[in-house]
Regions:
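Catalytic Walker B motif of ABC-type/P-loop ATPase nucleotide-binding domains
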Residues: 112-116
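Conserved ABC ATPase "signature" region
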Residues: 54, 58, 65-83
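Conserved ABC transporter NBD signature motif
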Residues: 14-25, 29-30
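Helix-to-loop junction immediately C-terminal to a conserved catalytic motif
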Residues: 6
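Conserved ABC ATPase signature
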Residues: 87-91
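Hydrophobic anchor residue at the start of the ABC signature
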Residues: 101
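ABC transporter nucleotide-binding domain
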Residues: 128-216
C-alpha cells in the first residue's frame, strides 16, 4: 500500500485520493506534501549526516534557508546535533533510523509514510523512535506499517488490519480490544498438553505462574473451563484473532 501511495508501484486498477483528487493527476503537488521512510535503510555511507540531509532537501526542492532551519531543529529534537558531522556509516542502527525519520519530515509534509521504522532496534531505541513519531504526528497523517504491536498501541488513532493485501478491519485500539473481549481466555494445563492445544486453538503467550503452566487461547469456541481475561487484553490478542491462520 505504501508503495502505491508513493507511486513506487504502478496500479493496475483503483484510485487513491488526496483531498478528493486523484494523486496521480496531482503529480508533484502531492509529492510535495508526502514524506516517506522506507523499511530498507538507504543512505550514502561516506556522506555526513548534515550533508546527507541537505542533499535530500535539495532533491525535494526545499529552499536552502528553510532547509537549514528545519535540519537544525530536527537534529536537536532527535538528539543528533552532536553527530551531524559524522559519516552515516559510523552511526548506530538507531541513529540511522532517526536520520531517516528526519529526511521523511523535511519540507513539513502533511502525509508521512513509515515502513517498519523500528525494525531491528533494541527496546530502548524502539521507544525513542516511537516517542518521536508520536511527537511529530501532530497535524499530520502518519501511516505506520509494523509487525511490532507495541509500536502502535499508544500512539495510533486508527489501526488498519490487513491480510493478503485486503483490509480486514479498521478501528481504534479500544474498539479492536473490545471486539475480542470474549475471544481470549487462559487455561491452566500440563506442558504435555500444549501440542494438542496448539492444534485446536490459536495459542498466544504460554506462561508459568506459581509452578503451573498457563496457555492463552484466542478464538471463537474456547474450552468452557478456561478463564476470561477481558480486563487484560492486548493488541497481540487482536492480531492473533484476526490475522493469524484462517478465520
Amino acid at each position: 500500500m505504501m508503495n502505491l501511495i508513493s507511486d513506487n508501484l504502478k496500479r493496475s486498477t483503483g484510485e487513491i485520493l488526496w483531498n478528493g483528487q486523484e494523486i496521480l493527476s496531482l503529480g508533484r503537488k502531492f509529492r510535495k506534501v508526502l514524506g516517506f521512510m522506507p523499511q530498507q535503510q538507504g543512505y550514502y555511507d561516506r556522506m555526513t549526516v548534515d550533508f546527507f540531509l541537505r542533499y535530500l532537501s535539495q532533491l525535494k526542492g526545499i529552499p536552502k534557508k528553510q532547509a537549514d532551519q528545519e535540519i537544525r531543529i530536527l537534529l536537536q529534537k532527535t538528539n543528533l546535533s552532536d553527530v551531524c558531522h559524522k559519516q552515516m556509516t559510523s552511526l548506530s542502527g538507531g541513529m540511522k533510523q532517526r536520520v531517516l525519520l528526519i529526511q521523511a519530515l523535511l519540507g513539513d509534509p502533511k502525509v508521512v509514510l513509515l515502513d517498519e521504522p523500528t525494525a531491528g532496534l533494541d527496546p530502548k531505541e524502539r521507544i525513542r523512535i516511537r516517542n518521536l513519531i508520536s511527537e511529530f504526528s501532530q497535524g499530520r497523517i502518519v501511516l505506520l506499517a509494523t509487525h511490532i504491536v507495541s509500536d502502535i498501541e499508544f500512539i495510533s488513532d486508527k489501526i488498519l488490519l490487513m491480510k493478503n493485501g485486503k483490509l480486514v478491519r479498521m478501528d481504534s485500539t479500544e474498539e479492536l480490544l473490545m471486539s475480542v473481549a470474549d475471544k481470549v481466555r487462559e487455561l491452566p494445563c500440563d506442558p504435555e498438553q500444549l501440542p494438542e492445544l496448539e492444534s485446536r486453538y490459536k495459542v498466544g503467550n504460554v506462561s508459568r505462574r506459581q509452578g503451573q503452566t498457563v496457555a492463552r487461547l484466542v478464538g471463537d469456541d474456547l474450552p468452557p473451563e478456561s478463564k476470561n481475561v477481558a480486563d487484560r487484553l492486548t493488541l497481540e490478542d487482536v492480531y492473533l484473532y484476526y490475522l493469524e491462520g484462517s478465520q
